[in-house]
A protein has these predicted regions:
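Non-catalytic, solvent-exposed segments at the cell envelope interface
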Residues: 2-431
């Protein structure tokens, strides 16, 4: 699907029929919700039995075996836009078109370190460029071959191991929102999107399930799918915050309903037993409650053979995946609002200035091309972040996004007005 076309989630009116249809749509959070329920101390036999009754399990042969209980764990989380079970009226109501297969509408990667001290969530753009059997393809289309093909794609393209698979129905998650009542989402600016149905003023909103749906569907903004990823992660943080709040989980009846809501929309691989999953979550209690680092794969747009792709930014993506595999804490990359208020001056030293500029803009930073860093004899090969005095934190966000080293700004370099960070683009940006 090219940018600008209607997404697979059309405007929804919350009628009885729409509630039934919502169960067939997909977004990610059910695993996080179920893990969080367990992590706050609800790992009772009743919870296990209720979850197991409502879960769906499938075999996924491509998964890597976990040798020891204490090993690191890597989950592939998918929301699918499959039309299975939808009649023509359903498709028209939800603006789904005539596509009969399935694609991954949301792809996230959850990494849990061996020492259980780090839990990180990374979103993949739907239009991310990947190779499938020697052919160029969008990541969203790779799921047409099922979970095994998507796992192979992540392994072959990014060397990411996958131990467990989960597909999550939006219906179950919308039921979680209904059980919670509302979810508070705060917006820095108005959001109006005819395609998703979003219509919000700037400020904080107690969103209903229908309003949340319009919010997380929206691709409104210059960064298209990366805008939607930001909104999905904002939603996840808000819901996980509500789930870990004492007021939410103090009511046993509410806990019971939440467990049923999450599990009903959840499909898991058949290797992850419910007691094992809840036991893992119990080990992560303090980490989940403290907040889960979330980010997206750094990428830049490119048009290839008439199709719009997001191409992974090589150095930044490789550094991110290395951290996930090794269980390292993900470096801070700033909030969406903080990145939007950070201006990066891009100095063209190597061959990758345009790619660096585009990657930073799609990550949410403001950029100015044409900054100067003085003599470049030792630069050109490796993209380097220069730290403006007093802007160390912002420089860290940029360095983490680009997977780049940082150096103090040379005394002789003048900082343009309004610029917070300077980046000297290198040839490595093209790899």
């Amino acid at each position: 699907m090219s940018r600008g076309e209607p997404g697979s989630w059309g405007p929804v009116v919350e009628t009885g029929r729409s509630r039934r249809l919502l169960r067939r749509l997909a977004v990610l959070a059910g695993v996080g919700g179920l893990l969080t329920l367990a992590a706050v101390g609800t790992t009772t036999q009743l919870l296990v039995e209720r979850a197991e009754t409502n879960l769906t399990r499938v075999p996924v042969p491509e998964l890597e075996q976990v040798a020891e209980r204490s090993d690191a764990r890597y989950f592939l989380l998918v929301g699918s836009d499959t039309r299975e079970g939808l009649d023509e009226d359903d498709r028209r109501e939800l603006t789904l078109g005539s596509f009969d297969g399935q694609r991954s509408d949301v792809v996230m990667y959850l990494a849990i370190s061996e020492d259980r001290e780090q839990v990180s969530l990374v979103s993949f753009p739907r239009d991310l460029l990947v190779e499938v059997d020697g052919r160029t393809q969008k990541l969203t289309d790779a799921y047409a071959g099922g979970p095994d093909q998507l796992i192979r794609v992540l392994r072959d393209n990014f060397q990411l191991p996958v131990n467990h698979f989960a597909a999550v129905s939006l219906g179950g998650f919308v039921d979680v929102v209904r059980t919670l009542g509302t979810v508070e989402i705060c917006l820095e600016e108005p959001l109006r999107d005819r395609k998703s149905g979003a219509d919000f003023e700037a400020g904080c909103h107690d969103m209903s399930a229908t309003e949340v749906l319009s919010f997380v569907r929206s691709r409104q903004g210059d960064r298209a799918d990366l805008e939607r990823i930001d909104r999905q992660q904002t939603f996840l943080r808000a819901v996980l915050g509500d789930l870990t709040a004492t007021r939410t989980l103090a009511n046993p009846r509410q806990v019971y309903r939440l467990t049923e809501d999450v599990a009903t929309g959840l499909t898991l691989d058949d290797r992850l037993a419910t007691p094992q999953m809840l036991g893992l979550a119990d080990e992560l209690r303090s980490v989940v409650s403290a907040g889960m680092p979330m980010t997206a794969v750094p990428a830049h747009p490119r048009r290839i053979d008439g199709l719009d792709f997001m191409v992974p930014y090589g150095p930044g993506a490789r550094a991110l995946f290395d951290d996930l595999r090794s269980g390292q804490h993900l470096a801070e990359r700033g909030t969406r609002e903080e990145r939007d208020e950070t201006v990066v001056g891009v100095a063209s030293v190597g061959a990758g200035a345009g790619i660096v500029d585009s990657t930073l803009r799609f990550a949410g930073f403001q950029t100015r091309v044409g900054a100067r860093v003085g003599p470049t004899d030792e630069l050109g090969a490796v993209t380097t972040v220069f730290v403006v005095p007093g802007e160390e934190e912002r420089a860290g966000w940029v360095a983490a996004t680009l997977g780049a080293p940082s150096l103090p700004l040379p005394d002789e370099v003048a900082v343009p007005d309004g610029v917070h960070v300077i980046v000297a683009s290198g040839d490595d940006a093209t790899t």
